[in-house]
């Protein structure tokens, strides 16, 4: 398709040749789709063409895909099929020459404008335009150089990291606004894991210095429903889901599960925070009983779930201490917008 309007081309600049990365820069799977240039990018192409003519997909989508495969930037590529959360959309236009409309002339070298857009489940996180000059024709090496320029931008901006995803989506800032106790009794905060999904939030794990099997997990994640819904019912439903997951795991391990307490009320030491808990024990034919206590609360617009590997008589005071010291982020822009649409 030809479109028109534009001005004379400037003198070609020097274009440093970038080297392909030695190690895998983006250790994830991504969908790859062909797309269309944004209006701003189209205008840049028209302005660069002395004849005001630019051709959509001047570099074919399969050529970009071949370049991505040769450079091995991602763990896996899924062309034209939505299998993964991340998507890479590539749009391209090529300036046309006045004589042949096919390649370069001495006075009119080819220029390409390639726009790379990164999306997560259909939400755009970033867009970057690569302007590249070609001698005589577009070569596979040219295409790799175009891709490498975008990849350098992606690495510099940390596009495929979880913190970038949360910030770009307008999700809660767990790193800056979540306050966790450093210790719970003799348990110490061992690690804090931010899920690569803003709807799953964060998990903090506490370990005991003497008993390696003793674990306390605190998960904080948004309530995926309007806040006008009954809070107590939301907590009960979420706890029931957690208990069902525990039952499934026990069944997979051929273990019998015994529910010691179920949907048992629990409050903090001020009586202002109310939640529910369940205590379970699982036992196999040739193993000792395994205990799990699960506690569910709603603070701000978040569920706070405590999971322990021991009975509630040990877990209750630890949970009450944690509630005393815990502060969760308020409602994020992402969840506010989502709840308005529900």
Q: What do the PLM-derived regions correspond to, one by one?
A:
Residues 132-158, 304-342:
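Surface-exposed amphipathic alpha-helical segments
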């Amino acid at each position: 398709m030809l479109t028109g309007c534009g001005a004379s081309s400037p003198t070609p600049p020097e274009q440093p040749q970038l080297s392909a990365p030695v190690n895998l820069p983006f250790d994830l799977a991504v969908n790859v789709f062909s797309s269309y240039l944004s209006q701003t990018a189209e205008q840049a192409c028209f302005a660069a063409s002395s004849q005001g003519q630019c051709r959509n997909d001047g570099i074919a989508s399969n050529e970009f895909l071949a370049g991505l495969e040769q450079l091995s930037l991602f763990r896996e590529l899924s062309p034209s099929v939505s299998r993964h959360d991340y998507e890479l959309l590539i749009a391209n236009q090529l300036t046309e020459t006045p004589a042949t409309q096919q390649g370069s002339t001495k006075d009119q070298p080819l220029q390409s404008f390639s726009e790379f857009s990164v999306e997560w489940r259909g939400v755009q996180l970033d867009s970057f335009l690569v302007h590249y000059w070609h001698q005589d024709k577009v070569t596979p090496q040219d295409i790799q150089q175009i891709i490498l320029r975008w990849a350098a931008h992606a690495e510099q901006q940390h596009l495929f990291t979880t913190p970038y995803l949360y910030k770009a989506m307008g999700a809660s800032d767990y790193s800056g606004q979540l306050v966790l106790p450093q210790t719970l009794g003799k348990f110490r905060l061992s690690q804090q894991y931010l899920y690569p999904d803003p709807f799953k939030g964060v998990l903090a794990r506490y370990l005991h210095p003497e008993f390696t099997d003793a674990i306390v997990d605190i998960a904080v994640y948004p309530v995926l429903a309007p806040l006008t819904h009954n809070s107590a019912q939301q907590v009960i439903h979420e706890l029931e889901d957690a208990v069902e997951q525990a039952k499934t795991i026990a069944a997979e391990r051929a273990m019998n599960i015994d529910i010691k307490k179920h949907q048992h009320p629990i409050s903090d030491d001020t009586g202002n925070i109310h939640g529910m808990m369940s205590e379970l024990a699982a036992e196999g034919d040739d193993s000792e009983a395994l205990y799990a206590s699960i506690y569910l609360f709603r603070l701000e617009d978040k569920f706070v779930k405590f999971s322990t590997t021991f009975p509630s008589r040990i877990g209750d005071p630890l949970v009450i201490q944690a509630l005393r010291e815990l502060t969760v982020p308020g409602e994020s822009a992402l969840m506010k917008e989502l709840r308005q649409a529900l």
